[in-house]
A protein has these predicted regions:
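Solvent-exposed beta-hairpin/edge-strand motifs
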Residues: 215-233
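Active-site-adjacent "subsite" loops/lids of carbohydrate-active enzymes
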Residues: 1-12, 25
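The substrate-binding groove and active-site-proximal loops of carbohydrate-active enzymes
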Residues: 1, 23, 27-41
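Catalytic cores of secreted or luminal carbohydrate-active enzymes
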Residues: 129-175
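Glycan-recognition surfaces
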Residues: 4, 41-149
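C-terminal beta-strand-rich structural cap/linker in extracellular carbohydrate-active enzymes
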Residues: 237-258
Length: 258
């Protein structure tokens, strides 16, 4: 069956295959079809070796899968289904808070498909940002001829910001504070060229104001930094502390340079 499906996919020109509910293939049992297999992970490895044999030249994305073994796929979904609302962004980022390190295991942490329809502008910005700081994003709306005009306009507005898209290089952000009582809403990444990126999400229905010490972000508090908020394009400077205001159900993301 796997060989037959692979032949069909290759004839159709597909280069990407998503494999879902993979954990089911690692379940323990009293016995397996192949009598040489005696554990769930043995069975999983057997199946994944077949997958690699028939789909190894494609981009393979795993969902609801064991973290390990990890060498059969390029990417793994960091959580389960996430859609278009702020609660979905929060859900994705809760998984990122504890799973950001998996970008060292897989080439990409997958935040699930980014859906723009039936959401506010702030929710769209937040959901796209949750994708790029996880490491990659795949658009999930209907862009066919019969698809919604509104969605296509949203896509042109929110999926074509070059500076936002450039962040999605496979390297995940990590939480500023990863062990609080509530979902983490601050994430940071330091790049090798000296740039830093800092994202603040507001999951609430009212405006958020906060002050963040630059030292807490891994920056030198004695230096002055140039900042650019990448959704609005607004530029500013900061030294010692960074004053941040985030509208209700929205996000800000700063590029920080000396």
């Amino acid at each position: 069956m796997m060989k037959h499906t692979s032949e069909l996919f290759h004839r159709a020109g597909f280069e990407y295959v998503k494999m879902d509910f993979m954990t089911h293939g690692a379940m323990e049992a009293d016995k397996w079809y192949n009598p040489e297999i005696q554990t769930g992970i043995q069975g999983y490895n057997y199946g994944m070796q077949l997958l690699d044999k028939y789909f190894g030249d494609m981009y393979i994305n795993l969902s609801i899968s064991p973290v390990f073994p990890a060498h059969y796929a390029q990417s793994r979904r960091i959580a389960c289904d996430a859609w278009n609302k702020m609660k979905d962004t929060e859900y994705t980022l809760n998984a990122l808070s504890y799973g950001w390190w998996q970008d060292k295991v897989y080439q990409f942490n997958d935040p699930d498909h980014i859906v723009l329809r039936d959401a506010t502008d702030g929710e769209n910005r937040a959901r796209v940002t949750s994708g790029v700081i996880t490491g990659i994003f795949i658009a999930g709306d209907d862009f066919s001829k019969g698809g919604s005009k509104e969605v296509k306009e949203k896509a042109m507005k929110y999926l074509t910001n070059a500076e936002i898209n450039a962040i999605a290089n496979g390297e995940s952000f990590h939480p500023v504070d990863g062990n609080g009582e509530k979902s983490e809403n601050q994430f940071v990444r330091m790049d090798k060229d000296g740039k830093a990126y800092y994202a603040v999400f507001n999951y609430m229905d009212q405006e958020l104001k906060m002050t963040t010490a630059l030292e807490r972000l891994g920056l030198d508090s004695s230096k002055e930094y140039r900042l650019k908020e990448l959704w609005s394009g607004i530029e500013s400077t900061a030294k010692t502390n960074l004053e941040v205001t985030v509208p209700a159900c929205d996000v800000v993301i700063f590029k920080v340079e000396e």
